[in-house]
Amino acid sequence: MRCLPVFVILLLLIASAPSVDAQLKTKDDVPLASFHDNAKGTQHKRIINWCCLVFYQCC
């Protein structure tokens, strides 16, 4: 009998959880991976620019 309240609470939590398809994708949605790729590219450009300013030989 002690497990019954826990079981009921879990059922309520599962039922109220948002589903994966809660929001439909639009044409403006961008995958998160592209943001990470852009950040890595920007960071790489900054490192190269800094290297060129400091050492002059890596350009």
From Swiss-Prot:
Post-translational modifications reported in the UniProt record: Contains 2 disulfide bonds that can be either 'C1-C3, C2-C4' or 'C1-C4, C2-C3', since these disulfide connectivities have been observed for conotoxins with cysteine framework V (for examples, see AC P0DQQ7 and AC P81755).
TM spans (from-to): none
Tissues expressed in: Expressed by the venom duct.
Stored Pfam families: Chi-conotoxin (PF16981)
Entry annotated with the keyword Signal: yes
InterPro entries membership: T-conotoxin (IPR031565)
A GO CC term assigned to this protein in UniProt: extracellular region
Signal peptide: 1-22
An example molecular function term from Gene Ontology annotations: toxin activity
Propeptide residues, chain positions: 23-44
Chief place of localization: secreted
Keywords carried by this UniProt record: Cleavage on pair of basic residues, Disulfide bond, Secreted, Signal, Toxin
Subcellular location(s) per record: Secreted
Domain writeup: The cysteine framework is V (CC-CC).
Protein family membership: Belongs to the conotoxin T superfamily.
Protein name: Conotoxin Sr5.4
